[in-house]
From Swiss-Prot:
It comes from Helicobacter hepaticus (strain ATCC 51449 / 3B1). It comes from the Bacteria. Its main location: cytoplasm. Homotetramer. Forms heterodimers with either ThiH or ThiS. This is Thiazole synthase. 1-deoxy-D-xylulose 5-phosphate binds at residues 164, 190-191, 212-213. The keyword Cytoplasm applies.
């Protein structure tokens, strides 16, 4: 397979990069932009409730990235039910014309930040029917992933570990099960702590990785962003190449034929 043409397709959108980055937790918009460009990402997600991308009277992310081709992905972080998220995205589309969205409805706002999948399922169906391209954040349940796909989700975004935890991929088998269960892209979201975590996610067969805290809170965000760029590429190529099977015992890499005989 020619990896040069190996693009990521989400709904009607096509991207060359399989890394998606967040915009939160940076010290300023300048660092956000520098790190995002270093990552090679073509999608940046922004929590509309925390950063008002619709405010034209002050510095905002839309203004910061206006000279780039980066696609904005508004998300509903902070929403706790379907009604809040639906209302938010309708306002976003009315103000910006953006209908490419990350649906994130949190069930446990105080501790785990785990998603409320029941509310998410309801919101996905309504928003998809209204023409939104819904990327649905969810838990690592392949049954729910399939239900979200059936409800109209254009991509499934299972968590790898709690948001911002940096614990890495805690559910390798479930990520694989989700990949088998759905036909839409699977984007590993939440829990990535370093570049190797992103690479592992891609080696498991994920179509893309979203990370924010691992870059924004790194000692050098720009350098970490570049590391993530290459990690995602390496993981994807490794997945496409096909790893060797795991074995319990050794297997010589050099042929035994023609060896010199002694004694």
């Amino acid at each position: 397979m020619n990896h040069i043409k190996d693009t990521l397709k989400i709904g009607s959108h096509t991207f060359a990069s399989r890394l998606i980055v967040g915009s939160g937790k940076y010290k300023d918009f300048a660092t956000t932009k520098e790190a995002t460009l270093a990552s090679g990402a073509e999608i940046i997600t922004v929590a509309v409730r925390r950063v008002n991308i619709m405010d034209n009277k002050s510095e905002n992310l839309l203004e910061t990235f206006k000279d780039t081709n980066i696609q904005f992905l508004p998300n509903s972080a902070g929403c706790v039910n379907a009604k809040e998220a639906i209302t938010l995205f309708r306002l976003v589309r009315e103000a910006t014309g953006i209908d490419f969205i990350k649906l994130e409805i949190i069930g446990d706002i105080d501790k785990t930040l785990y998603p409320d999948v029941i509310e998410s399922l309801q919101a996905t169906e309504i928003l998809a029917n209204e023409g939104f391209c819904v990327l649905a954040y969810t838990n690592d349940d392949p049954i729910m992933a399939k239900r979200l796909e059936n409800a109209g989700a254009s991509a499934i975004m299972p968590l790898a570990a709690p948001i911002g935890s940096g614990l890495g991929i805690q559910n390798r088998y479930n990520i694989g099960f989700i990949k088998e269960a759905v036909k839409v892209p699977v984007i590993v979201d939440a829990g990535v702590g370093c570049a190797s975590d992103a690479s592992i996610a891609m080696e498991l067969g994920a179509d893309a990785v979203l990370t924010n805290t691992a870059i924004a809170q790194a000692q050098n965000p720009v350098t970490m962003a570049e590391a993530m760029k290459y990690a995602v590429k390496a993981g994807r190529l490794s997945y496409l190449a096909g790893r060797i099977p795991r074995k319990a015992y050794a297997s010589a890499s050099s042929p035994l034929e023609g060896m010199m005989q002694f004694g």
